[in-house]
Amino acid sequence: MADQPMIEMKNVTKVYDNGTVGLKNINLKINKGEFVVIVGLSGAGKSTLLRAINRLHDISEGDILIAGESITKTKGKNLRLMRRKIGMIFQSFNLVKRSSVLRNVSAGRLAYYPTWKTTFNLFTDEDKQRAYEALQSVGMAEKVYSRADELSGGQQQRVAIARVLTQRPEIILADEPTASLDPKTSRQVMEDLKMLNEKFDMTVVANLHSIELAKEFGHRVIGVRAGEIVYDGKMEDTPQSVFDNIYNGGKGKEED
């Protein structure tokens, strides 16, 4: 179906082993090509929601569909194949610090190989060319042979974005991608995500602390408080009072 959501969460609840409720009856549809930002207090459930989408956190109840197929019920090889469609960008960059930028970015292709091959990082010339082109796209080609630990935080995050581009997913989940960066670098990182969204029609879902960045880059905003969605609307139709309510109307709880 042409109007089938890229991501759909149906009555999703997440309860941790200690009894903490991370998500409470979440119902959400995100269409292909949207740039969605999720806002809320620290501990409101933003990261839990994002990580549930690709099953970094398994949910307790409900179902999550990726392009109409349940990721919740998928196992083994089929789960690995489904995760190819989903790229993840973390606050902590998740790079191999002692490896070169090229090798880190080439790792975006690992999902396309059997486990034995990924163990030895056996990348083809085509993989390396894809990686170089991805680095060009984010303005980092001159660092191709540098070690990851020689880069600034902003440069490392842009390398992480290039790695996702090399994967060629349909969905990008960005978990606080600018949290540890200065304002100028944060904007550069968001511009890179915007480029992936517009040039490659990738669906982007990003958790953001910065309301300014959320307003500038998001097509749609979702407000989360205490594990529940308390607002969902177009950014252009969202007044400041909505953000005030999301941040001042309730208290977050601790996440993993």
From Swiss-Prot:
Gene3D superfamilies according to UniProt: P-loop containing nucleotide triphosphate hydrolases
Membrane topology summary: Peripheral membrane protein
SUPFAM superfamilies named among the record's database cross-references: P-loop containing nucleoside triphosphate hydrolases (SSF52540)
InterPro entries (UniProt xref): AAA+_ATPase, ABC_transporter-like_ATP-bd, ABC_transporter-like_CS, ABC_transpr_PhnC, MetN_ABC_transporter-like, P-loop_NTPase
E.C. no: 7.3.2.2
GO terms for cellular component: plasma membrane
Function according to Swiss-Prot or TrEMBL: Part of the ABC transporter complex PhnCDE involved in phosphonates import. Responsible for energy coupling to the transport system.
Protein family per UniProt: Belongs to the ABC transporter superfamily. Phosphonates importer (TC 3.A.1.9.1) family.
Protein name according to UniProt: Phosphonates import ATP-binding protein PhnC
Organism for this UniProt entry: Lactobacillus delbrueckii subsp. bulgaricus (strain ATCC 11842 / DSM 20081 / BCRC 10696 / JCM 1002 / NBRC 13953 / NCIMB 11778 / NCTC 12712 / WDCM 00102 / Lb 14)
Source organism phylogeny: Bacteria, Bacillati, Bacillota, Bacilli, Lactobacillales
Name of the encoding gene: phnC
